[in-house]
Amino acid sequence: MKVRFAPSPTGPFHIGGARSALFNWLLARKEKGTFVLRIEDTDLARSTRESEENIKASLQWLGMNWDEGIDVGGNNGPYRQTERLDLYKEVTQRLLDEGKAYECYCTPEELDAVRQDQMDRGETPKYNGHCEHLDEETKAKYIAEGRKPTIRLRVPLNKTYSFDDMVRGHVSFESNGVGDFVIVKSDGIPVYNFAVVMDDHMMGITHVIRAEEHLSNTPRQMAIYEALGWEVPKFGHISLILGKDYKKMSKRHGATSVEQYKQLGYLPEALVNFLALLGWAPEGEEEFFTQDELIQAFSMDRLAKNPAVFDIDKLNHINFHYMKNLSDEELFHLCLPHLKEVGLAPDSLNQADIDWLTLLCSTFRDHISYGAQIKEHVGLFMGETVFLEEGHEEELRAVLNEETAPTVLGAFRNALAELDEITPDVVKATIKAVMKETSLKGKFVFMPIRVALTGQMHGPDLNNIVTLLGKEKCLHRLDNVGALTK
């Protein structure tokens, strides 16, 4: 068992690519096989080393180590396609020598005209074979005109290419709908379908698991395997990932790259857990899986044919589950970049800053599903003025206009002014003393204090909120509570 993940380094590492890598990786680990990382960088105009580094870093962050390939090495390298061009030339020359491929001098304009003519007649566009039997005189004429040939594979007529897909079952294609297709471009670079076949064969790949969009490439690749007399690997084409509107996932659906989710403060184990469930249905009702549990549970026969829907709410639900296991210190580090982003954390932190920010993060632990969400809850600590929560102004004013509210707030303000130190335990004792002094309990004490200090009816632990606001800010807000009742 040998599988590969072979991304093109042409942009941010897409979440769909991460899922393809994961299914390959899980199968390799389940079957005690080999997982290869290969880089398909023949798109010279768009491929960058920066993108390649992002792919590698993302895989490592997700915990998907590879056994062979880029940086790791192996017996079947090089593992970048641009470093394998000499190998490709040898195979190309073999096909030319055996008459299984030929040079094509047709210009893009000529090909477009043929394609349009076929479409006008209601035919499926394919190459018309114009250059299949060119004589040497015509070739010389084309070369003199400055034409540079592509290389096309001869595809047999009236042949059926069929295979048993590991996900979709029996699939077949007719060769007459394929036509002789280009395998090497005019610049000498092999096209995707040709390079991938050579790489998979030379690297001993036995199982190819990839996105459904590659299904239409399979008959062309099978034609190349046949022309070279090579064994065809087993194919499995996994379902597309759609947004909640059932359209192909794109930027309009939110973050689409692994790096974006990392920067937003999602946990790698949560993202892996979520990606595994995008198109794979485990036995039973369990939805949370450790890496080892995923390896043990994974099987190709439980991959779905139908598109998988990327549900951000489900990802948040899963990430929230994993965040519960973080220590306060780990949660602080997860949220810190986002607290710096809103100016609540200085670039250089002293111990007092760290203690305050750690308490802040732990206070809102049950209110956030990912690190960046902390930004939605910290506004009440950033200014002197309290604003009543939008849409709830009337009920909030009603709390402050309760007959007992001024008594409670006055007692709390006086007690707070006497304190030398504010901690959650000290605040708890202070509120308890206010209850005793006013002979009031429960919401008649907690609610006016919370509304006066935060402008909200509900929220996290009030003792922590008071501690985080600090004495001076609390006194200022209590002294100006009258503005909220108008």
Roles of regions detected by a PLM:
Residues P78-T82, V184-K185, M203-H214, L242-F274, ...:
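Conserved phosphate-binding loops in nucleotide/dinucleotide-binding enzymes
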Residues D328, F332-T438:
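Small-residue-rich helix-loop
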Residues H14, N24, I55, L95, ...:
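Residue-level signal for inorganic ion chemistry
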Residues R29-D41, F194-H207, E231-L242, N463, ...:
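Glycine-rich phosphate/pyrophosphate-binding loops
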Residues R94, Y102-E103, T107-H237, G243-M249, ...:
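Active-site cores that bind ATP or allylic diphosphates and position pyrophosphate for catalysis
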Residues P424-T485:
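Charged substrate- and nucleic-acid-binding regions of tRNA-handling and nucleotidyl-transfer enzymes
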Residues M1-D120, N217-W230:
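N-terminal Rossmann-like or analogous alpha/beta NTP/dinucleotide-binding catalytic cores
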Residues I15, Y261-E269, K305-D311, L349-L359, ...:
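Structural motif
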